[in-house]
From Swiss-Prot:
The keyword Transferase applies. This is tRNA 5-methylaminomethyl-2-thiouridine biosynthesis bifunctional protein MnmC. PANTHER family: SARCOSINE DEHYDROGENASE-RELATED (PTHR13847), TRNA 5-METHYLAMINOMETHYL-2-THIOURIDINE BIOSYNTHESIS BIFUNCTIONAL PROTEIN MNMC (PTHR13847:SF283). GO terms for biological process: methylation; tRNA wobble uridine modification. The keyword Oxidoreductase applies. It catalyses: 5-aminomethyl-2-thiouridine(34) in tRNA + S-adenosyl-L-methionine = 5-methylaminomethyl-2-thiouridine(34) in tRNA + S-adenosyl-L-homocysteine + H(+).
Length: 666
């Protein structure tokens, strides 16, 4: 089974206090004046001070090889801040920095390295506060009130650039070609990297690098850049600068999963839950006009209306896509929730998943074999589990120390209120009945007889996403469930973490002295009627898993307090995020896909129609990243996920997988 942890950098600090890599026997930055060298080589070499004021797009994208200590990023961020202060009315409003790092520093080493540059402290402290765990793939950090986006890709750059989604092609405005010297790290400085840089560079993009090595210059020229030498910094004689003067036409791999956005920054979102709320915020951040249509009287009346929901990642013993997506989604969710300027009941108390029988123990053992960072997930024996959760369990398991619980109802309403302050238009008591394409717009028809017209539409209305002609074929299903609300007792109040078994039990919410226990599971059932049998079963599952635990007998469901909701799920347990696929056109165009992959056209979709749904039981974990992914896609901005995992979220994936194998789609 593949392991999902990245090896952190091993370094030491020399006599000058400069960090030195033990792996590459090279300094991370110059002993003389690393800060000034960065300004000269990368900011000056890319002429950023000249280009920022005349940039014709709201976003400027920089890509970098070798994040290291983050010196280049912090220096650029500082310069961008100065530019924004001096030019508040400029078209350029946001900075997007993409960087690759095979051996990321630990947070402690990062903080030590940053002590070198006190003038960068205001920016360095923000970076340290959000520094991600050593997990492979992309970590998106939203900084400076989301005016600066940092995508940290952990892994080998030559492998990662091959895994980038095609939507990133020809988007980069400037390249910082950095890293340890070619003589120290020859594996990085390859034709594969140079070709990837050219593929990602937009026409007119620039690059700069500290080296003047001939093979680097020739490799970049062969990739498509026009190169020239420039005087190097300080005692260095020369460095290299380049410009992408060609208009390359990159090959589109896997066109059946291609994603398209919109040039029109106006949309209608259908829904009223956490996904709709977070998507609204993500689009508003990018300058969109957003109108939210909700069938209910107020937000969070559907699956997002529970009093307490657990936050922890889904892991799988066999599905690589789940293991790539959910740990990244979880860490992004924690960063986003912590940064939101809103109040909602929550406690990051940890979540422990117990192995109460042989089958669950085997499942947990397989999850632990993923070798995730201990800060994300680690093993507990029976004694450690009882110490962690605070009650007798007599079995071990897996614990997620950064997990916990939150109130989805409060969070959803608070986020929509925040979005409303930022320009969101809300329309409640609007039940959408149909969507009709009219020229380049969508006409929305509501149960009341009212109509509305929008450039683009996002369906984020839970288990009702497949109620329309365009989405009816989507392979999703409803899952009804009931969560019981129980009063605390002295024994139950000892529970310190969210407890997961063949169900779940939350610690008490101190604001109402109640716990949540659940949840029943009824596939295909859309009923929201309270059921006495579900109430009884929620308690019985706890007793069955912990038959010797006296505290469990104090769970009292006789008050008949509960909440019934309906989730939307898929059989592969992954969300659906992206363009709404045209089912009939997909089957027609890809009828011979198994034999004609090389000549396949991009996936047939309904232009301007998107879906964000099928979040299942882990919506609190997946909704933040899914909203960010869709907002980036719709805005034609970099998407924070590799192409393979993105394909696993594509709404057409289940059909395309069969078509690729020459099987019939039913």
């Amino acid at each position: 089974m593949k392991q999902y942890a990245i090896q952190p950098a091993t370094l030491e600090f020399n006599a000058e206090g400069t960090p030195v890599s033990r792996d590459f026997d090279d300094v991370y930055f110059s002993n003389d004046n690393g800060l000034e060298e960065t300004r000269y080589v990368f900011l000056g070499g890319n002429r950023l001070a000249e280009r920022f004021p005349v940039h014709s797009h709201p976003l400027f994208i920089v890509a970098e090889s070798g994040f290291g200590t983050g010196l280049n990023f912090l220096t650029l961020w500082q310069a961008f801040d100065s530019f924004r202060s001096a030019h508040p009315q400029a078209t350029l409003q946001r900075l997007h920095f993409i960087s690759f790092e095979k051996f990321p520093l630990t947070r402690d080493d990062l903080a030590l390295a940053h002590q070198h540059w006190p003038e960068l402290a205001p920016w360095a402290e923000q970076l340290q506060a959000q520094w991600p765990l050593p997990l492979p793939g992309c970590h998106r950090l939203l900084l400076d009130r989301s005016r600066v986006t940092l995508d940290l890709w952990f892994g080998d750059i030559n492998e990662l650039t091959d895994q980038l989604d095609a939507t990133l092609n020809q988007t980069v405005d400037a390249w910082f070609l950095d890293g340890f010297a070619p003589a120290k790290n020859p594996d990085m400085w390859t034709p594969n990297l140079f070709n990837a840089m050219a593929r990602l560079a937009r026409p007119g993009a620039t690059l700069a690098t500290f080296t003047s090595a001939g093979f680097v210059r020739r490799g970049l020229q062969e990739a498509g850049f026009t190169m020239q030498k420039r005087k190097g910094f300080g005692r260095k004689r020369e460095m290299l600068c380049g410009v992408m003067e060609q208009h390359l036409m990159p090959t589109l791999y896997a066109p059946w999963f291609y994603r398209s956005g919109s040039e029109k920054r106006e949309t209608a979102i259908i829904g009223g839950g956490i996904a709709s709320a977070l998507l609204s915020l993500a689009l508003l951040r990018r300058g969109w006009q957003v109108t939210l249509y909700c069938a209910d009287d107020q937000p969070a009346q559907g699956a997002s209306g529970n009093r307490q929901g657990a936050l922890y990642p889904l892991l799988s013993k066999h599905d690589a896509a789940i293991n790539r997506f959910f740990p990244t989604a979880f860490t992004f969710a924690r960063r986003l929730y912590d940064a939101l300027p809103v109040s909602f009941d929550h406690d990051w108390c940890g979540v422990t998943q117990l192995g109460w029988d042989e089958k669950s123990q085997q499942k947990i053992a397989q999850m632990l074999s993923l070798a995730l960072p201990a800060e994300l997930a680690s093993a507990l024996n029976a004694e450690e589990a009882e110490q962690a959760v605070g009650v007798t369990t007599r079995c071990g398991g897996i614990t997620y120390p950064a997990g916990g619980w939150l109130c989805p109802e409060q969070l959803t309403r608070a986020v929509i209120a925040l979005a409303t302050e930022q320009g969101l238009q809300t329309r409640f008591r609007h039940t959408l009945t149909s969507l009709v394409a009219q020229e380049s717009r969508w006409q929305l028809r509501f149960m009341s007889g009212e109509t509305a017209s929008h450039e683009t539409v996002v369906l984020a209305n839970g288990h009702q996403i497949n109620r329309f002609d365009q989405t009816r074929p989507l392979p999703v299903y409803a899952v009804g469930g009931q969560v019981s609300h129980i009063p605390t007792t002295p024994a139950l109040s000892a529970l310190r973490q969210v407890l997961c078994y063949d169900g779940y039990l939350t610690p008490q919410n101190p604001h109402n002295q109640q716990h949540c226990i659940g949840a029943s599971y009824h596939r295909g059932d859309e009923s929201t009627v309270w059921r006495e049998e579900d109430q009884r079963q929620n308690r019985q599952r706890l007793l069955d898993c912990f038959p010797d635990a006296k505290w469990a007998t104090e769970v009292d469901v006789s008050g008949n307090s509960a909440r019934c909701g309906v989730r939307c799920a898929t059989r592969d347990h992954l969300p659906m995020v992206g363009n709404v696929p045209d089912y009939h056109a997909t089957l027609t165009h890809y009828a011979d896909l198994a034999d004609n992959k090389t000549s396949a056209a991009p996936a047939p979709v309904y232009p301007g129609l998107f879906v964000l749904g099928a979040l299942g039981s882990r919506g609190l974990c997946s909704a933040p990243l899914c909203a960010e992914i869709l907002a980036a896609q719709m805005s034609n901005e970099p998407i924070p996920l590799d192409a393979g995992t993105l394909a696993a979220l594509n709404p057409n994936r289940l059909w395309v997988r069969k078509l690729l194998k020459g099987k019939a789609v039913k």
